[in-house]
Amino acid sequence: VEKKIKIAQGQDTLLLPFVLSKQVYLLNDVVVNSKGEDPAYAIIRKAIKKRPDYLNEIKKFSAEVYIKGQLVLNDYPTSFFGKSLAPSNFDTVKNRILFLSETVSDYYVDVPNKERIEVKSSKVSGRSNGFGLSNPQIISFYQNNIDLANGLNPRGFVSPIADGALGFYNYKFEGTFYENGIEISRIRVLPKRKYEPLFTGIINIIENEWRLHSVQLSLFKEQQMQLLDTLQIEQIYVPTKQGWVIKNQVIYPKGKFFGFAFSGSFVQVYDQFNLAPQYGKKFFGNTFLKYLDSSNKKSSAYWDSIRPVPLGIAEAKDYAKKDSLEKIRQNPKYLDSLDRIRNKFKLSGFLLTGQTINKQSKKVRIQFDALIGSINYNTVEGYNASFSPRWTKRYTGRNSVSVEPSVRYGFSNTRLQPSATVRYNFGKKYFNNIGIGFGRKMFQFNNDIAIPETQNTVQTILYERNFLKLYEAQYINIGYGAGLGSGLNFRVNFQYQNRLALPNLNKPLIFVDHINRSYSANTPSPASNDHFEQHQAATLTGVLTWQPGGKYIELPEQKIGVGSKAPTFTLTYKKGISNLLGSDIDYTKWSLNVSDDLPLGLGGTFQYRATMGGFVNANKLFAPDFQHYFGNQAYVTIEHLKGFQLLPYYQFSNQSRFYSTVFAEYHLNGLLTNKIPGFRKLNWFLVGGVSYLHVNNMVDYTEAIIGIENIFKVMRVDLINGYQKGEPTRTGVRITVPIVFK
């Protein structure tokens, strides 16, 4: 029930008495048929039959929507990774609001896939320049499969009135009630089986029309929900002159992660519906979310006058407290004092995680890598150490500049390698960046850094395997990248290298002597030149990336690309330029790549990445210029959908006119494993895949993969077989762990 009131000028308080009428549920004599069926089933069957009609009932609409979101920290551990979290040194208390925002937007929709959101006002507690949550997400239970968020369950959840819902749910009739003369049936919804993506709760269905009046549904962890412990959804629909529309939607998440317990509420209130708007041909462009100028500059008086849901006491206090703290935190003296505390030297950071120094008043950040990843061993340099600090200065908008000087020293070959990289990011409408790098450094023959150095150090020390193959080059690299709009991005890069071959050390260290094994030469055998004399190489590379239907968020000072549901296409052209600055190479090669993630609802997710390419000409080139593929000879996996998990690193490197690769994976996301007692409690998922390489009628190599993922949320284990005609089958196990090797 709504009632608009007017407050006279100067009037601070208005007494408005009201009486809530009782909600009376009528439970008439229940007639159970010969099959012993609850009367709720007859109502549900009629609702299922009408579901497609109501799903497609509204073709387009416009509305005003108010969104309020908050996230609350309910509890936290006394310590986290050895650091005390007592309130004295941890900026929190229990039941403290971590995030609070409000927005008011005009929402325009043209079914099935056109929408536009114009944010008229936005407010974030403690961030006067911030932009709040502004994307309306109407959960339609008229859909067969409810896709709440990929992180919650990539399979989605089955609607209680889906076409096949009777196979998933039990229903119980709990009576009827009347609202404005309309008879409404209350139905309790219960999952038939645990560990299925199903809802629990109440749906209220309008008699004779068999449409939803309101819902109160919940999801629990045993419904294969990720990240959260519970999620409650409440909706109310109301009639208008043009039809029934959603009025309110509230989502209540609740969870616990590493001892941090949190809860929240996300309210959406819809008003001023128009179910017959007139849209021009160009009304829906590639900008689906736009924050109007000054949308985050509204006064408190404005918000008090338009807010449909009053602030709670804790919310009002949070606004007052954080707005005051923001003014204090903008004081340079306060920021400097805070930096002095946070920038103190930490041995754990220096050794394991890296160290960051912030100068907030000057918008400067200096980052240092962890020592553990900066010292390595290989058979070319012996022990080597790298030091690469990064200095970043932020300006207004997306403008920033970063400088990364680097120095590397090989203790056995006594070679010092200094280099530097400078980057500048800019662009008001679309993202642009320009960068230059120069100096002397080590390059892998596969310049895409196919083998992490830390991983190679472990392989060399423990297994007497020196897979890392290096050469040295004096170089200069100049690159420019830009967003072009409509899902298009472009990058061009020029690089010049003076390449120098490097031999292994005369007597590299052998830490663990393996019988019948020795270090291999520092050449990417078997597919490259036997001779690698000193030479010069000038290359020009252009990359065009396109995702059709690419959408953007438009802020007052910049546009941000958010992609689309379409596949991503990448076209790459690379030219080895002969005689430029003494360049000795002469070749042209190309590649075309397409990749996508395809949600299959309850069936899981299918991902693929396919590439074809080759050399148009290969008049003269050296090992670094070959077409290389990402292989893997370690037990830790390389990036899925990018490389071959059992393939020796340079085995099929080539200069052929044509090649193609296909990587595909099918993630069951709980399908099948939710029927296996041990797996369903652990929430482990099955995954299967195939990787294929074809090289100009000379090579056909295939890997078949079956694995288990979502182990402790972050791990994956794969069993892989590799097949090549005329060769024994390769078999191996690969483990995916949340560790980034450098």
Predicted regions and their residues:
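Structured extracytoplasmic
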Residues: 24-25, 31-184, 190-198, 258-376, ...
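Residues that define the transmembrane beta-barrel architecture of outer-membrane proteins
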Residues: 229, 381-385, 414-418, 472-476, ...
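Transmembrane beta-strand segments that form the barrel wall of outer-membrane beta-barrel proteins
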Residues: 216-221, 366-377, 393, 398-422, ...
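C-terminal outer-membrane beta-barrel translocator/porin domains of Gram-negative envelope proteins
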Residues: 433-454, 458-471, 530, 568-672
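Transmembrane beta-barrel strands of outer-membrane/channel proteins
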Residues: 65-67, 389, 405-409, 434-442, ...
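Short loop/turn motifs that connect adjacent beta-strands in outer-membrane beta-barrel proteins
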Residues: 55-57, 345-348, 356-366, 379, ...
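Periplasm-facing N-terminal accessory domains of Gram-negative outer-membrane beta-barrel systems
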Residues: 1-29, 33
